[in-house]
UniProtKB/Swiss-Prot annotation:
Annotated site location: Transition state stabilizer: 8, 212
Taxonomic source organism: Bacillus thuringiensis (strain Al Hakam)
Record keyword Isomerase present: no
UniProt name for this protein: Acetylglutamate kinase
Listed InterPro entries: AceGlu_kinase-like_sf, AcgluKinase_fam, ArgB, Asp/Glu/Uridylate_kinase
Gene3D superfamilies (UniProt xref): Acetylglutamate kinase-like
Binding site for substrate: 40-41, 62, 153
Keywords on record: Amino-acid biosynthesis, Arginine biosynthesis, ATP-binding, Cytoplasm, Kinase, Nucleotide-binding, Transferase
CDD domains registered for this protein in UniProt: AAK_NAGK-like (cd04238)
HAMAP family noted in UniProt: ArgB
EC number: 2.7.2.8
Subcellular location: Cytoplasm
Top EC category: transferase
Pathway listed: Amino-acid biosynthesis; L-arginine biosynthesis; N(2)-acetyl-L-ornithine from L-glutamate: step 2/4
Length: 255
């Protein structure tokens, strides 16, 4: 049980997680060292609306001036993180919630002054994660990071990819509400970078699946060897520990 697995669960999925999801995490934990990274977009948007603060995104990244960062921090590091931790523990999975600024876990470089406090992962303090895992806890990470004693928002997909790359994880699993990439109604079990580009060009991959596969491609570029896109509302783990869904790698695929 030396391999790490990073599980990324988007904010829109958190309310859809059922007993099956937590059973899958238990199965993964029997064979791997598990880290969970979560998003929180819908809850952040709702809180910003309550505060009469505009929601603005550019190229998929949330524009994050100081007033927005305060709300992002409150939601991600507070209610969203703790709800997921409590849900895991309700299913007898010991978890510790922490944010990327705790123990300097996620250090970032600012993306651009134009979009405010948004950062890209530049360094991961893996000793903190390994310490928690060695004490049999699942680290549950809120994707904010630190630079020069300021807190920055991090896209949850790239935060998960950065953590997976730093841990040399066996796999990064994206939890979604679909079975994976479909081609002519059938699940594409294995694919690679070039095939995904072809699928997008030919319209095989459309709509909400496009950002998911783009996140997978970005993860490959960051050094992650294997990414799986799975349906978190169904059993997505084989007895062998392999994922049921679409697996994306750099190499040539056999579909």
């Amino acid at each position: 049980m030396n391999d790490y697995i990073v599980v990324k669960c988007g904010g829109s999925m958190l309310d859809q997680l059922n007993d099956v999801f937590f059973d899958c995490i238990k199965k993964l934990q029997q064979q791997y060292k598990v880290v969970i990274v979560h998003g929180g977009g819908p809850e952040i948007d709702a809180k910003l609306k309550d505060c009469n603060i505009n929601v603005e995104k550019r190229d998929g990244l949330r524009v994050t001036p100081k007033e927005v960062m305060d709300v992002v921090q409150m939601v991600l590091c507070g209610s969203t993180n703790k709800k997921l931790v409590m849900n895991l523990q309700k299913h007898n999975l010991l978890a510790v919630g922490c944010s990327g600024c705790d123990g300097n876990l996620l250090q970032v470089q600012p993306v651009s002054g134009e979009i405010g406090y948004v950062g890209e992962v530049s360094y991961v303090e893996t000793a903190l994660l390994k310490g928690l895992i060695n004490m049999n806890y699942i680290p549950v990470i809120a994707p904010v990071g630190i630079n020069d004693n300021e807190i920055y928002n991090i896209n949850a997909d790239t935060a998960a990819a950065g953590i997976a790359a730093a841990l040399s994880a066996k796999e990064l699993i994206f939890i979604t509400d679909v079975d994976g990439v479909l081609h002519e109604g059938k699940l594409v079990k294995k694919t690679d970078e070039s095939e995904i580009a072809t699928f997008i060009e030919k319209g095989v991959i459309t709509g909400g699946m496009i950002p998911k596969v783009q996140a997978a491609l970005a993860s490959l570029k960051m050094g992650v060897q294997k990414i799986s896109i799975v349906n978190g509302t169904k059993d997505f783990t084989e007895v062998t520990g392999e994922c049921i869904g679409t697996t994306v790698t750099k190499g040539v695929s056999i579909v």
